[in-house]
Structure formats: structure tokens, C-alpha cells
Amino acid sequence: MGKNNKKYCNSQRFSRYIYLILRQKESNMTEEFQIRVLPQVAYNEANLKAYLAQEKGFDPETIYRVRVLKRSIDARHRDIYVNLKVRVYVNEFPQDDAYVKTEYQDVSNKPSVIVVGEGPGGLFASLKLIELGLRPVVLERGKNVRDRKLDMALITKTQEVDPESNYCFGEGGAGAYSDGKLYTRSKKRGPVDKILNVFCQHGASTSILADAHPHIGTDKLPRVIENMRNTILDCGGEVHFQTKMTSLILDGNKVVGVKAIDNRNAISLTREFFGPVILATGHSARDVYRYLADANIEMEAKGIAVGVRLEHPSHLIDQIQYHNKNGKGKYLPTAEYSFVTQAQGRGVYSFCMCPGGFVIPSATGPEQTVTNGMSPANRGTQWSNSGMVVQLNPEDVEGDDLLRIMHYQEKLEHDTWLQGNRKQTAPAQRMADFVNNRLSYDLPKASYAPGLISSPLHFWMPSFITKRLQEAFKTFGKQAHGFLTNEAVMIASETRTSSPVRILRNRENLMHIRLEGLFPCAEGAGYAGGIVSAGIDGERCAEMASAYLEQI
């Protein structure tokens, strides 16, 4: 009887298989599946088609396309799997709906809103204003995204930094040349998806819609930013490069515009621009913070995180994260990591991890050395780096000056410059030597182009930072065998993790708590922490600026 039942079940299964084959040959359809597969299966569409045909009973000839909707890697155990959500197109090709397109209108003769700063907050504010029928007038202190690249190259050649055109200032902001990571902890899925779709509309790969930790790549992002600017211009908006805001124009407690210096020509000109102001100047615009403090415009000190940029050979991180001496192999991407712990009452964590990337010089002025990281789209260099930073709260710095956290940053950056021979050469130390309070007599080959100089970071950096980093590194080394090693090098100093102040605004209308018509925006105002969250905040500020104009 058991054998007969088994034969009956097999017969039923075979009949259903034949039914599916016949149905597929006769009709068009799409189906979605959640699957967990080996990396080689997820590697390309051909492999996925073969897998789905075998596992789901499809005729391979009828599968026209497989679109990956979501992708994440499960590397918690020795056997690595890729979790996928896929859409299978049977007897039909997908429509041109890989991303949701936003319609932008002509706003040539519409009311103006001044957007100060063309980083992600300013760009997305500007595009949202156009959606809402308003005309953005963008003021960017730096150069366009292509020209600023030339100035960044000069940092390595001349060991000097242009204070208006560098890795922080210029079209696209600090994020334009720091990997283009789009991962966010925001739970607001709708706004996050909108930001990603706008990037796709302007040339980013649609893979960012699927990846759990999406990134565009520092080599691809400039073209996307350029396309976003062209949308602004094509719709009747304005973009003014090398135009730095110097002050707000006030009518009592109402902001009606800004004054700015136009530095595009040999003779600088002072210009005035009128309209409500979205202030999206980024976390490194210290002249703006000083102006706001001097003008008694309400702000508060905000905590940041400070530390170093830590660089390992990428193959070592691959071996650790993928539990395999052969590393990532052919089918896996360069490995990422994320570490967090508590040390002496403060959080210590990895920040802005860049697999297969470079460490870059991110100073914005003379006599300072600052590090950051970036990765190309293929994440293909021989190094992987991350900020390793310690939480610094306002109460950790003496005094009640609103700008005391900023002054702490400035002192550490200046000390780093002094330790680097008063150039952009960065002081550095092998990781295990640092933990054991030993000077590194030599340094490993590293990606930091201006060069490294061996330096006892454990000795001259603030003990508030070094003691906590030493404790945290021991913890991370226990969590990931091989992570704490002298193959890794610490490069000082990582200080620009977020804004050192928060410009106070109303929770409901996002306007400054006292000044009507001023909308502090995104990371520079203390309300975002990365490209996506800055973009979301930019869109929200644009919506509130639109509502404000409707009322006046």
C-alpha cells in the first residue's frame, strides 16, 4: 500500500509539472519567489534561470527574464548563502518599470526658494521643490562635480588644500567622493525608496533598489549628480557654483534671502538672493556655524564621534567575514564588516566602512589633516577601510560654548597635521602596536595617496579616544579572529562623522524656532547622517517651504 501511495504521489507531481509546462507555453505570467541560494547561483541571471527551472518546475525556454528585487548575503556561518526576492517573467519581457519615475515640471516663472548647498540635502530639496511647482536657486560654495576632482588631485601633488574645493566642498557634497553608500537605518521605507528611485532615474544602477547595503560607487556618482543638476537647470532652476553664503537677509525675525560672495571671476562680487532659505551647508561648513553663533541664531552643541581610519588588506577581511582562507572567491563581493561595543561608558564603532576602497584626505582648510574613506563601484582595490570612532558627547568637553565640539575637532585635526610633518602626510601606526603602546618602526603599504608617517598615536592623541579604541580593538579581535593584527594600519584622524551642532528647528514645520522662512536642513544642521537620510530631510524641508509660501 505504501509503495502504491508513493507511486501515486510521484504521478501527481509529474502531472503537475506537465501542467505547468503546458500552461507556461500557452500564457504570459509573472511570479515572485523568496529563495535562499549558494553564491554561484545568485551570481548571474543564467544561473538563476537554471535554478528556478529545476526547483520551481519552469520550462527554461519560457523564462524570459529574472529580476532581483531584494538581495542580501548571509555570512553568519561557514556556508554562505544569498537571500533573494526574485520576479520571474514567463513568456514576456518586463516593462520599463525597474524604478518609479518622478515627473518634473517647468518652474521658470514660479516663486523662488534659496537652497544653500548642493550636497544630497540640497539636491533632493531642489528636485522636490520642482515637483511642487517652485523654483530652486542653488548656491554652492565649491565647484561643479568634475572641476572639484582636479582640485582634489592637487592635494596629493602639492600637499595643500583649496578651502572651497575639496573632498567636502563642491557639487555633491562630502558624499560625492566618499563611496556613495546608500544604506540607512531609517524605518520610513516609502521615503527611502523614493530617494533610491530618483538616483536610478538619474543614472544609478537599479541594483541599489535590491541590495541590502546599496552603494553607487565614487566613480559612478559624479555622473548621477551631474544629471540631477541638469534636471534642475532644464526645469528652470538655477545653480550658482563658487558662490558662498556669507549671511542671511533678515526682516525682523523673518529670513527673506541671503548675501553671498560670487568667486567665479578674478574680482569677487557680493550678491543678494531673495526667498525662503533651505540651509543645507553640510557638516564641515564651520564658517556658517561661526556666523550663526555670532548672529545669536539658536543652536545647540551636538555629540559626534572621533577616532581614526583603520585599513586592512581586503583579502584578510574577506577571509575573516566569509570564514574561508580563500577569501571571497569568484562569486562573492568584497566583504564588509560592522563592529560596535561599549568601552568605559562610551560607544565605539566602525563608521563608513569602505570595502575594496581608499583612504582619502578630507581636510577643508590649512593646517589640518582629516581622513575619510571611499570605494569605486567594483570595490576592487587591495584594501578595505573603516572609520573606528569613539562617541563624544557635549558633556565630555569642558565649557558651555555652543561650538566647543567643533573646537575639539579643530584642535585634533591641527595636532594631526603637526604630527604629519605639517603636510597632508598622515600620522599612522600598526593596529597591534597601537594596542600594545609600541611605536611602529615601519608601516604596511597603504592606499592613502599623500603618504603616511609612523607616529605613536597612543601617545599624542587624547586618552579619551585612545584608551577606548584599545579596549574596543581587543573586543573586536575576539569577535573576529585575525582582525586585530599588525597587517592593519590606523591613520589619523577621523573627525567629520557628523555635525558638531544642531540648528534648532520646529518639529512640525521644520522652520527655525525663531526665524521664519529659514529651514535648517540635513546633516549640516544636525538632522541627518548620510546620503539617504539627508535626501529625505531635504525633501521634507522642501515640502515645508512650499507650505510656508502658500501661507504668506
Specify the residue positions occupied by each region the protein language model found.
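Mature extracytoplasmic/luminal segments of secretory-pathway proteins
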Residues: 5-6
